[in-house]
């Protein structure tokens, strides 16, 4: 079930909100847990059992780790819990990838059956790992209430696409959060803005990318336009979904971290990754990079730490060599900026810094969206004239002229301009102009629903992760 589906907007969400606000405080988490399990089972009825097993396993392992505090056996319990969680994730996500590569080099064939990836498994596995590790470190108290722990793991606003919520950030909110009309209003605003980004921008621009990707040949300009279309699509798709998650969290009294901070205005690739998928970067920093020693080590070890983190970041996104190369691509760039080009880059005009960043990010997206490394290099070759049908052709001109409004909307929407304009029009000293906000939200919501009713193209790119 997608947030941008009609069944969610007009059936699931209204019923869940109604029941949630009617029941007493002590059973609100029960309502959230049941609703979240229904939400997940709607699209993955079989894998609901895997999620329930994960909840029970990590609940009891957390209790075990807490009881063994200060003893050597606590470390063994921690390692066991982490290994089991990673094994489950690896089995469903990387089993086929590993066997396929082994079959390519071994003299015999290993038969295997392709497994469907449980939706959201990468996200909720990282959440349970953050809980387990923080219990071991003593950063949080062990959760003894199974309902509260289950609510944390399954909470539908961020279950299938994040943001990745670390347990420490919601530990108190699970029991002591407070709902209010003001918070609900802010949540509705975030949700509708995210829905508009997803439906009106990501879906529309995404169809442009799909049309270009289906071409047999393309000019240099067409190849860049296709890459630009995907660049806009993945940002509005994922950040829109994250905004909806943050908004839904507010409606139920929670405060989740913002997952995006206008990454396409970054002046370096290092800055880009401070602004893109912030919760994932925060997770890897807290639970991988810092335990490896961070930057408080020798230069060779620091380089290795960065490459390990970015190798794992690429692998987290998918089981293919494309994602591995994509992750290492960023690892090498960040190392280069850290030790060689960072100071030089900082002296360049701001526009040049942003252009430099966007070119590298767009090249990275080619690795990301291409089905194979070969097709990625072919597309990149087209972008620089190798194998292209020419520099500019009638198809490229048509794509520019026919879709000029979406190109402009993509550029403007990637900057804080609309946010600042909305804040100025709708908010005054953090208090919303209720009538104007209501009119804007209603108008955007109606446009989104009209699109969903008439169009069938409504993918969500991060479902595969």
Segments predicted by a language model, with ranges:
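Membrane-embedded transmembrane alpha-helical bundles that form the catalytic cores
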Residues: 1-464
């Amino acid at each position: 079930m997608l947030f941008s589906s009609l069944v969610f907007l007009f059936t699931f969400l209204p019923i869940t909100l109604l029941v949630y606000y009617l029941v007493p405080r002590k059973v609100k988490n029960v309502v959230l847990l049941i609703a979240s399990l229904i939400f997940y089972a709607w699209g993955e009825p079989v894998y609901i059992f895997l999620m329930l097993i994960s909840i029970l396993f990590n609940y009891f392992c957390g209790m075990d780790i807490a009881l063994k505090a200060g003893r050597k056996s606590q470390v063994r319990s921690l390692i066991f819990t982490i290994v089991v969680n990673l094994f489950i994730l690896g089995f469903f996500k990387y089993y086929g990838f590993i066997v396929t590569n082994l079959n390519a080099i071994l003299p015999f064939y290993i038969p295997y059956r392709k497994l469907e990836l449980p939706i959201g498994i990468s996200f909720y596995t990282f959440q349970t790992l953050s809980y387990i590790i923080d219990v071991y470190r003593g950063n949080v108290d062990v959760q003894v209430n199974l309902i509260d722990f289950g609510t944390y793991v399954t909470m539908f606003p961020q279950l299938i696409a994040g943001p990745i919520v670390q347990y420490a950030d919601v530990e108190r909110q699970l029991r002591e959060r407070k709902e209010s009309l003001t918070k609900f209003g802010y949540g509705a605003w975030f949700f509708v803005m995210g829905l508009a980004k997803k439906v009106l921008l990501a879906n529309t621009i995404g169809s442009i990318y799909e049309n270009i990707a289906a071409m047999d040949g393309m000019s240099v300009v067409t190849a860049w336009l296709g890459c630009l279309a995907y660049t806009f699509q993945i940002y509005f798709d994922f950040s829109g979904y994250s905004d909806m998650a943050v908004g839904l969290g507010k409606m139920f009294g929670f405060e989740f971290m913002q997952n995006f901070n206008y990454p396409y205005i970054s002046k370096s690739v290092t800055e880009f990754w401070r602004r893109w998928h912030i919760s994932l970067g925060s997770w890897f920093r807290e639970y991988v990079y810092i335990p490896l020693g961070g930057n408080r080590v020798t230069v060779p070890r620091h380089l290795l730490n960065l490459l390990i983190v970015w190798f794992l970041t690429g692998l987290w996104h998918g089981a293919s060599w494309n994602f591995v190369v994509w992750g290492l691509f960023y690892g090498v760039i960040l190392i280069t900026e850290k030790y060689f080009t960072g100071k030089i880059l900082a002296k360049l005009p701001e526009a040049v810094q942003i252009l430099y960043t966007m070119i590298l990010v767009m090249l990275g997206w080619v690795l990301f969206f291409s089905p194979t490394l070969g097709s990625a290099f072919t597309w990149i070759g087209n972008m620089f004239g190798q194998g292209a049908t020419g520099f500019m052709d009638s198809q490229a001109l048509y794509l520019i002229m026919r879709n000029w409004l979406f190109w402009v909307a993509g550029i403007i929407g990637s900057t804080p301009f609309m946010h600042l304009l909305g804040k100025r029009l709708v908010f005054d000293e953090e208090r919303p102009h209720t009538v104007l906000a209501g009119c804007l939200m209603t108008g955007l919501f109606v446009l989104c629903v009209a699109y969903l009713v008439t169009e069938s193209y409504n993918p969500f790119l991060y479902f595969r992760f």
